[in-house]
């Protein structure tokens, strides 16, 4: 009995000391939650109410935006960057009409700048809801608000959504596969 009461705490202490340290939210290298939400909000504004000054301040010059959903609709090869730079994002997104956008949830904000959100977009005829998920990657570029919210900017955007619904909503057609190509539900 005495042996196990000594071994258990010593074993736990050894495990704890071997585990990698996690950065607490208060760490200066960790993105504060409120800044992550501000970045998310500003990114959404580039879709719903585009403003060049906001986008320029928000997006790191090395930004890469990838979305096979958008690439399919736009005729860009799948697996390629949708917007390979902040300039390309501003030129492309700035030319698009605003969309409706409802956040279903901000599910993850990591210390190292990842922000994961689920959403529903509304465009055109709004026949079908187009649900999507986006992973934003923010990086610290400075100590203050000279760039991005409090020095943080977006370096990566990864978005996927129901492109079939989007295509129908913008006036295209996207019939489901027929016959044996359909998934069977039991």
Model-found features: residue ranges?
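C-terminal and inter-domain tail/linker signature
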Residues: 19-186
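Cleavable N-terminal signal peptides of Sec/SRP-targeted secreted and luminal proteins
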Residues: 3-19
């Amino acid at each position: 009995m005495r042996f196990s009461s000594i071994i258990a705490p010593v074993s736990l202490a050894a495990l704890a000391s071997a585990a990698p340290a996690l950065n607490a939210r208060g760490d200066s290298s960790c993105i504060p939650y409120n800044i992550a939400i501000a970045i998310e909000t500003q990114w959404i504004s580039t879709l719903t109410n585009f403003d060049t000054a906001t986008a320029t301040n928000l997006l790191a010059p090395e930004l890469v935006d990838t979305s096979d959903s958008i690439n399919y609709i736009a005729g860009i090869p799948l697996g390629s960057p949708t917007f390979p730079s902040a300039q390309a994002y501003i030129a492309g997104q700035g030319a698009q009409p605003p969309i409706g956008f409802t956040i279903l949830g901000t599910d993850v904000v990591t210390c190292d700048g990842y922000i994961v959100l689920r959403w529903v977009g509304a465009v055109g005829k709004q026949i079908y809801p187009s649900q999507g998920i986006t992973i934003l990657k923010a990086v610290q570029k400075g100590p203050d608000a000279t760039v991005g919210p409090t020095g943080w900017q977006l370096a990566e955007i990864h978005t996927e959504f129901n492109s079939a619904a989007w295509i129908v909503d913008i006036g295209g057609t996207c019939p489901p596969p027929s016959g044996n190509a359909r998934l069977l539900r039991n």
